[in-house]
Amino acid sequence: MIQQESRLRVADNTGAKEILTIRVLGGSGRRYAGIGDVIVATVKDAIPGGNVKKGDVVKAVIVRTVKERRRPDGSYIRFDENAAVILKNDGDPRGTRIFGPVGRELREKKFMKIISLAPEVL
């Protein structure tokens, strides 16, 4: 459950290490975001020479959350950290590599490029 001011790790090679959520997209009253939801965020920590710099405002999709999520078959999935992948304006990932596992919910939300780049889909 990601909300405004939540900090997330960045799970790609764009150069950002940490982002802070500005807004959860998907309606005016939307408060929380889960795996597969898109957020607007600002880069809080970045490595020098990366594609994004500290202070940049970016769109990102959430790929891992600590809060468990119930699946249709009754099972639950949760991760050890909150993480996101930075997106371009057309919805494709800005980086060329994804680090760590991602949730299967991304497939239902049509983020196929992230699914194909990820080392593991849980």
Swiss-Prot record:
Q: Which Pfam families match?
A: Ribosomal_L14 (PF00238)
What organism does the UniProt record list as the source? Streptomyces coelicolor (strain ATCC BAA-471 / A3(2) / M145)
Q: Identify the keywords attached in UniProt to this record, alphabetized.
A: Ribonucleoprotein, Ribosomal protein, RNA-binding, rRNA-binding
Name a single GO cellular component. cytosolic large ribosomal subunit
Q: Which family does it belong to?
A: Belongs to the universal ribosomal protein uL14 family.
The gene name reads rplN
Q: Tell me which InterPro entries the record gives.
A: Ribosomal_uL14, Ribosomal_uL14_bac-type, Ribosomal_uL14_CS, Ribosomal_uL14_sf
Example GO biological process: translation
Superkingdom of source? Bacteria
Q: What is this protein called?
A: Large ribosomal subunit protein uL14
According to the record's subunit comment, the protein's assembly and interactions are:
Part of the 50S ribosomal subunit. Forms a cluster with proteins L3 and L19. In the 70S ribosome, L14 and L19 interact and together make contacts with the 16S rRNA in bridges B5 and B8.
- What job does the chain carry out? Binds to 23S rRNA. Forms part of two intersubunit bridges in the 70S ribosome.
| UniProt GO molecular function | large ribosomal subunit rRNA binding; structural constituent of ribosome
